[in-house]
């Protein structure tokens, strides 16, 4: 079982009580993606395995013995899981995860981040170029992904879905999960129509702590 990026949010007790090895992945040190509380879980689960972006160690949010740290281009692999670190257009990394015959991608802060109402044309072109370069690298390894978790953040302005649109146009996705929208569920779920037009199943999120079972992909 994997638990990715943790904020002050909700991890139901049953997740910590489920059998099997527990993996916790954190993509970078920003507080909406990393919370030191996750390190306390090892008291309940001595078998827990932490896979963190190396910037978390650099910024002294955790110590060297707390986790396995990886950078873009690194791979963590054991008898259960394979995790490849890809790039970000902010800090840290994104995760490509192969687990039990399924392939998952967690974008971290990888996105086409620009504020079209505020950014200059040059800034917009650079943001888009940097983003598409990272997507091309991922596409070479993973032209198709079963589950993608990707930012759909209306706080960046009217073109906030552009990065998500470009992503699903380039990589075949079975299930798309919006994220990074804070409490703006309507804004995150607004991507549903476009995702479904590209053949994705879209998971609409209604509240914090909502869970989904995905037995058949």
Named regions from a protein language model:
Residues 19-20, 45, 81, 129, ...:
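Structured loop/turn residues at beta-strand edges in well-structured enzyme cores
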Residues 4, 20-32, 50-55, 105-108, ...:
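Active-site neighborhood of phospho(di)ester-bond hydrolases with catalytic His/Asp-centered motifs
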């Amino acid at each position: 079982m994997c638990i990715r990026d943790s904020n002050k949010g909700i991890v139901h007790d049953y997740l910590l009580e489920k059998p099997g090895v527990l993996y916790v992945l954190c993509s970078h040190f920003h507080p909406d993606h990393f919370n030191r509380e996750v390190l306390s879980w090892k008291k309940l689960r001595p078998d827990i395995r932490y896979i963190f972006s190396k910037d978390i160690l650099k910024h002294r949010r955790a110590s060297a013995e707390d986790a396995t740290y990886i950078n873009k281009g690194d791979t963590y692999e054991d008898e259960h899981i394979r995790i490849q670190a890809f790039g970000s257009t902010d800090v840290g990394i994104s995760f490509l995860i192969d687990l039990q015959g399924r392939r998952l991608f967690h974008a971290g802060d990888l996105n086409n981040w620009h504020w079209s109402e505020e950014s200059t044309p040059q800034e917009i072109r650079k943001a888009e170029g940097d983003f598409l370069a990272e997507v091309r690298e991922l596409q070479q390894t993973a032209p198709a992904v079963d589950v993608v978790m990707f930012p759909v953040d209306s706080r960046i302005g009217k073109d906030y879905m552009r990065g998500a649109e470009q992503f699903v146009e380039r990589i075949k996705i079975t299930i798309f999960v919006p994220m990074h929208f804070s409490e703006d569920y309507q804004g995150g779920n607004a991507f549903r129509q476009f995702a479904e037009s590209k053949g994705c199943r879209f998971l609409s999120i209604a509240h914090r702590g909502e869970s989904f079972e995905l037995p058949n992909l």
